[in-house]
Amino acid sequence: MAKMTTEEAFVKVLQKHGIQHAFGIIGSAFMPISDLFPKAGITFWDVAHESNGGIMADGYTRSTGKIAMCIAQNGPGITGLVTPIKTAFWNHTPMLLVTPQAANKTIGQGGFQEVEQMNLFKDMVCYQEEVRDPSRMAEVLNRVIEKAIRGSAPAQINVPRDYWTQVIDIELPPIVRLERQGGGAEAIDKAAKLLSNAKFPVILSGAGVVIGGAIEETKKLAEKLDSPVCSGYQHNDSFPGSHPLAVGPLGYNGSKAVWN
């Protein structure tokens, strides 16, 4: 057990998960924690509008494979994240969504800029949880990040603003990573037979390739089969467009080569 403030516990969990970048706008509901970012090696990217922060977090993760955090002031600031969070949800992008809330003692009584932030994002995240006890700050944050990574989608932690600067005595929770398993031997054998007998195989790459971390394997398969590769809607990131076998995206805005 170790004594620390709730914001110190929050930052220590971010560090354990390797989160190095946060995007958005920090208001009074999150200021106590932002002072700890520089020493913790976390870069905060201040933006002109909250939507920009969410879009940048989505793009950062899709281009690097590393999870990021987006943040805004409770109430009107948080509502600015609706579009990018829903976009990240459909893009299958793991993301930590931090939503500071009105003070605990004022929730439900028209607290400062109070908005029902859990209901707002309930169909845009794979998991959401509100901190109901300051001593569980690290536990809840750790669980939310794990859910975002496992679900490959945004996950939300809702934190009452008066839960910062609380002194707690806790042990930091362990990180539990689940290994992604490959296909079974029988399924792989059937797939190999289908591909070997195909007259003109075409590969459609999409979210599964990204989530499975299989971009390099997809390149090798395409080269072995000499097969053109088209990318699913919103997932040009699943196959490098500079590759000679890449023919572009599928969908209403797809390339002519794909349709042909």
Give a label for each model feature.
Residues 1-260:
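N-terminal alpha/beta PP-like core and its mobile active-site loop of ThDP/TPP-dependent enzymes
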